[in-house]
């Protein structure tokens, strides 16, 4: 009987040790979470916009401007309500004038802006005070104007839109 009690006692202690061992099968780890500054802008539309002036009014130097509003853009930003979009060209225009109108509901459109002389260092604000969030399908309107006194010319320009603080 004594032997049976010892065996039963050892069995119960073994069971208690097994339960304690299995109760310690967890581990913890600290996880650091960060959301970094995100600025993204994308333009949708034709790769090349063709603006051709082919009309004017007799007796007026200013020719009839050419306009295109087939492009849109999408923007996402999570940093600051002081965020803005700027526009610039790859090089100054020698003749004529190129203007841009960039719509926005998250920010304030600057209206139609002349970007003919705006290069990287002198980019023009086209949308200001953009709230944090995202919007898509916002219109971009280009207007090309020239005078009869400018004569005939052709130019190819690259327009860059940039999201900045």
Question: Regions from the language model: what does each represent?
Answer:
Residues 23-165:
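N-terminal small/polar-rich segments of proteins
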Residues 1-4, 9, 19:
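Positively charged n-region of N-terminal signal peptides that target proteins for export
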Residues 10-14:
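Single-pass alpha-helical transmembrane signal-anchor segments
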Residues 15-23:
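Sec/Tat signal peptide C-region and signal peptidase I cleavage site
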């Amino acid at each position: 009987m004594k032997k049976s009690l010892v065996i039963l006692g050892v069995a119960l202690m073994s069971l208690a040790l097994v339960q304690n061992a299995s109760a310690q099968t967890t581990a913890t780890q600290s996880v650091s979470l960060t959301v970094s500054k995100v600025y993204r802008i994308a333009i949708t539309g034709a790769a090349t916009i063709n603006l051709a002036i082919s009309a004017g009014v007799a007796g007026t130097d200013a020719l009839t401007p050419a306009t295109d509003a087939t492009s849109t853009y999408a923007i996402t930003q999570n940093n600051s309500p002081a965020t803005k979009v700027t526009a610039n060209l790859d090089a100054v225009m020698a003749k004529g004038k190129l203007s841009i109108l960039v719509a926005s509901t998250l920010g304030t459109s600057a209206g139609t802006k002349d970007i003919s002389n705006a290069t990287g260092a002198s980019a023009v604000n086209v949308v200001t005070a953009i709230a944090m969030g995202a919007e898509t399908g916002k219109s971009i309107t280009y207007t090309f104007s020239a005078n009869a006194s400018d004569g005939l010319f052709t130019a190819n320009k690259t327009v860059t839109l940039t999201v900045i603080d």
